[in-house]
Amino acid sequence: DETQKHFNGKIDFVLHSIGMSPNVRKNRKYYDLDYNFMNKTLDISAVSFHKMLQVAYKQDAIKKNGSILALTYIAAQRTYDSYSDMANAKALLESICRSFGMIYGEKNGVRINTISQSPTKTTAGKGIDGFDLFFDFADKMSPLGNASAEECADYCIMMFSDYTRKVTMQNLFHDGGYSSTGISKKMIEQYQGSK
């Protein structure tokens, strides 16, 4: 109610972009997770999205045909050694998007999508062991290179617009082509050079 008063009405769009794992920060391996930390990871990185959607839904806070986005990562579908329990959190986040996308779409035409972004140099990203090497690897594997934080913001703005009014319940890759690349010429050349 207070948010709607502050914005003089219903909300046009929302971006969920929070994520954190104490297990990742403490470099705990997936086979040795602290379950209290894991619960915190899931709560902050995924369940918070459900909580926000549930409140918005019950308060009827999002305008008809509004747009809701959450940032995710390809580790929800693939294995990345140092991503640990964040991969589970991102998989849950994407599932919440699909489940609530059906409900909110039928009720009010509200679109809910996730954007699977390239590795991005953020505070959270820097906490991942070996992040700089992985950032370089993904950049070399991607035909267009890694998408920057600014480019991700541009993509979000497009997804909030009416140009995407029929796009919902999707996980959209914004990664320079990384998600569809088997191996790039740059990586083959680097591998050959290391022999």
Predicted regions and their residues:
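Conserved hydrophobic beta-strands of the Rossmann-like cofactor-binding core
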Residues: I11-G19
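Short C-terminal tail/terminal secondary-structure segment
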Residues: T168-K195
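C-terminal helical subdomain
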Residues: V47, T114, D132-V167, L172-G176
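Short beta-loop-alpha junction of Rossmann-like oxidoreductase domains
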Residues: V24, S118-G130, I183
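Hydrophobic structural elements of the Rossmann-like NAD(P)H-binding subdomain
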Residues: L15, L69, I112-I115, G125, ...
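Catalytic loop of short-chain dehydrogenase/reductase
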Residues: G19-E106, S116-K121, G145, Y178
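Conserved amphipathic alpha-helix within the SDR
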Residues: D1-G9
